[in-house]
């Protein structure tokens, strides 16, 4: 891959993060390749199929199309900790919104539970929002995310958050001094979990 064009998404996106983590796993740095910002997985797939790039990160269901058309995975990032799902609220509004936070988090948890407990419904939702109509791709997408997992306890993954800080440190040196706990307040999640 050295010197070749690798497709990715906008900086800071999960795909861009995954691209850089995958490069690191392959013993490369962003300076070793030519990163081309293309858009989402659909654009990366199209660029691969037309030979505009030699590699790129993708996620389900797009990666299943790549598998079917003869492309092969060079690295997976599933073994790397990552903070995937989160709600963002300004610190100054936490107290003002306190009465709404636990019900909101309860609804998020209900959605996660529905994902795991109602596969037929979840497959319809995946098909609708990915605009995918191949039943095999839809089912494999469901299984991928079921295994990748959503934390039912909604707790922050400190190792996952630290991984993001480490990633950011390459371009923002001040994040080297930061600790994950500086960036989140999990009091409402803890309150929800203690009410079980």
Give residue spans per PLM region.
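Conserved C-terminal helix/tail region of periplasmic/extracytoplasmic solute-binding proteins
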Residues: 165-196
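Short coil/loop linkers at secondary-structure junctions
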Residues: 24, 29, 72, 132-133, ...
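Residues that form or immediately flank small-molecule/cofactor binding pockets and catalytic motifs
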Residues: 11, 40, 78-79, 182-188
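A generic structural-conservation signal
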Residues: 10, 32, 57, 75, ...
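Pocket-lining segment of extracytoplasmic ligand-binding domains
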Residues: 42-131
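Secondary-structure end/capping motifs
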Residues: 96-176
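Proline- and acidic/polar-enriched loop/turn elements at helix boundaries
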Residues: 35, 60, 78, 180-181
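Bilobed "Venus flytrap"/periplasmic-binding protein-like clamshell domains
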Residues: 1-68, 84, 158-163
């Amino acid at each position: 891959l050295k010197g070749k064009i690798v497709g990715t998404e906008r900086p800071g996106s999960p795909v861009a993060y995954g691209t850089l983590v995958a490069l690191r796993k392959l013993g490369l740095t962003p300076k070793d390749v030519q990163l081309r910002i293309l858009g989402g997985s659909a654009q990366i797939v199209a660029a691969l199929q037309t030979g505009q790039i030699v590699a790129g990160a993708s996620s389900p269901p797009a990666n299943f199309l790549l598998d079917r058309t003869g492309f092969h995975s060079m690295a997976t990032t599933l073994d790397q900790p990552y903070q995937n799902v989160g709600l963002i609220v300004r610190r100054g509004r936490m107290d003002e919104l306190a009465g709404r936070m636990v019900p909101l988090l309860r609804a998020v948890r209900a959605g996660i539970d529905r994902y795991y407990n109602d596969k037929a419904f979840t497959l319809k939702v995946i098909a609708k929002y990915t605009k995918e109509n191949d039943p095999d791709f839809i089912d494999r997408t469901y299984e991928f995310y079921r295994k990748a997992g959503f934390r039912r306890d909604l707790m922050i993954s400190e190792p996952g958050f630290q991984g993001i800080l480490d990633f950011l440190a390459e371009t923002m040196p001040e994040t080297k001094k930061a600790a994950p706990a500086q960036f989140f307040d999990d009091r409402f999640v803890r309150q929800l979990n203690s009410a079980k």
